[in-house]
Design a protein with these regions (language model features):
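Acidic, metal-coordinating catalytic segment for phosphate/diphosphate chemistry
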Residues: 2-41
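Short, basic and Ser/Thr-rich N-terminal targeting/leader segments
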Residues: 36-40, 112, 218-220
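Short beta-strand scaffold segments in enzyme catalytic cores
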Residues: 40-44, 116
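Entry beta-strands of beta-propeller and related beta-repeat scaffolds
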Residues: 50-51
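A conserved beta-turn-beta hairpin within the catalytic core of GNAT-like acetyltransferases
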Residues: 60-64
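Short histidine-centered catalytic/ligand-binding loop motif
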Residues: 66-76, 185
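Unchanged
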Residues: 72-164
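Nuclease catalytic cores that cleave nucleic-acid phosphodiester bonds
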Residues: 166-172, 176-304
């Protein structure tokens, strides 16, 4: 059984607006944790400088240790939005210069903390915006474990470090996925492809659970290959659409080969139930999941 602990009189307030209802302790059988609706932190990684760490003020919980910018989520706020908001409030981190790609969640049932891992696309210098920090520094990856770390971050760092630099890519065989459900798609192939693109867009925002019970949700780059009468579908915020000039299978193989050759730590997964195409992708070093694997995850997001 969990219970909320009201804020103590005189606790420091946020510099941006009044205290939020999420700024409170939650207590249960696993201990006391900050954030009525859970909490989130940002692990910002700059390939040339390392990760951004916050030296926590002595008055704060686990004061004097090094950890991630972050804090309590607002009611109804997603982990990515919350982590970016907190990092901006505490360290002036510009959300537009980051690319979040994976979320790692620790949960005790009545409370959870999500680490949002993001790559820095354009360099920036953090600034201490409130009294929660003694210092903000870019720390080389190999030096992180040498610092006196916040216990939660210290426990999670060994599993977070291997995620740095990974670039998950999802390549979708649109014709195969659309054709896996007899919902009348053959009457309007273009419209069916647009609907799939929109559902993929929602999945990218919510995150893709790659493995059961892993605690990881990925935000991959999504490439959707269309063919025939489905050609001409436009890109969306999170989905890039490629028109296959001929057979979609050949275009998918070409795209996979280019992605794998482009960066050593890219993880390329193709969604198709076509066995011949799957074998060609695996020969290149890519992973393959069937259409049902994707539609189950899309349904879990879009049917909420």
């Amino acid at each position: 059984v969990a219970r909320n602990i009201p804020p103590a009189p005189g606790e420091p307030r946020r510099p941006f607006g009044p205290r939020d209802s999420g700024d409170a302790w939650v207590e249960g059988e696993r201990g006391r944790f900050w954030g009525r609706y859970g909490a989130a932190g940002l692990l910002a990684w700059d390939p040339s400088r390392g990760v951004l760490l916050q030296h926590r003020a002595e008055w704060s919980d686990q004061g004097g240790t090094w950890g991630l910018p972050g804090g309590a989520l607002h009611a109804g706020e997603g982990a990515i939005d919350g982590a970016l908001r907190e990092a901006h409030e505490e360290a002036a981190v510009p959300a537009g210069q980051l690319k979040p790609w994976v979320m790692s969640t620790f949960s005790v049932g009545y409370w959870s903390y999500t680490t949002v891992v993001a790559e820095v696309l354009a360099p920036f210098e953090p600034q201490m915006n409130d009294s929660e920090s003694i210092a903000l520094e870019w720390v080389p990856v190999e030096s992180v474990s040498s610092a006196p770390l916040h216990p939660g971050f210290e426990a999670s760092w060994p599993s977070l470090r291997p995620l740095l630099g990974r670039q998950p890519q999802l390549v979708v065989d649109a014709a195969n996925v659309v054709g896996s459900r007899p919902d009348g798609w053959w009457r309007d192939r273009f419209g069916a492809a647009e609907r799939l693109r929109d559902r993929l867009d929602a999945l990218a925002v919510a995150g893709v659970a790659a493995e059961a019970a892993s605690g990881l949700l990925w935000s991959p780059d999504i490439l959707m290959v269309v063919e025939g009468r489905a050609r001409g579908v436009s890109n969306s915020a999170h989905v890039r659409v490629v028109d296959a000039p001929g057979e979609g299978d050949n275009e998918i193989v070409d795209q996979v080969a280019a992605l794998i050759a482009g960066q050593a730590k890219q993880d390329v997964t193709v969604i198709t139930s076509d066995r011949e195409l799957a074998a060609r992708v695996e020969d290149l070093g890519g992973r393959v999941h069937g259409a049902a694997w994707l539609t189950e995850r899309i349904d879990a997001v879009t049917d909420r």
